[in-house]
Amino acid sequence: NFGFSQGFEVYLSPRSERRRQARVERLDNPNVALEGEDGDILDSAVEFLRAHRHERFFLYLHMMDVHQYAYSEDTPLFGTSYSDSYDNAIRWVDSLLGHLLAALNELGLRDRTLIVFAADHGEAFGEHDGEGHARNVYGEVTQTPLILGPPFRLEPGIVVEARSENVDLWPTVLELVGLSPLPDPDGRSLVPEIVAAAGGRAEPDGDGVAFAQIDQAWGRSPGRPRPMVA
């Protein structure tokens, strides 16, 4: 699990042999549908919320269905191509997040919960002669959503134009909930940018961007829909 379980009192990870087999089949046939498993994660999350509704809690949902192009056949709105499967997965996970928000409202937790929605990368579908992620730094791969839902309403919703990185998440969350900052964080708190945007002022400039070269060779085998790494 890449160490994701560190520090958690309860850690659950769904595993499906049927899902793994479907992933193998999809290497030769991009139209093979993967059944989404994030619904199981959501059910466990709601159960956790019900059990801890009267306590302070930290709940982390690592939803992987979009990463795997997996979805429920009850929700697809697009076609069956490779990129359509990705869109179907986004629609599926979006519906699950709607259920999560509904559960928070039902349990009376929404007005005292900070919600953070983030992603670690986008996905390329040939926009710059590449597919997937982790192979270039074009916008389709590096631009990701970051949505902060505080336990109070901001009217209208604030859009922060300043560039941010995922290493900024922890410093931002800690400041928003009133906890001490990390001693030597890699990122910075985005609260100054949020406050500036809320006040209609210019947002502070962030640090510069550094790029790393990944010494891997990528190629495509005839007849296979996905690139391979050498």
Regions found by a protein language model. Give the residues of each.
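Catalytic domains that recognize anionic headgroups
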Residues: N1-A230
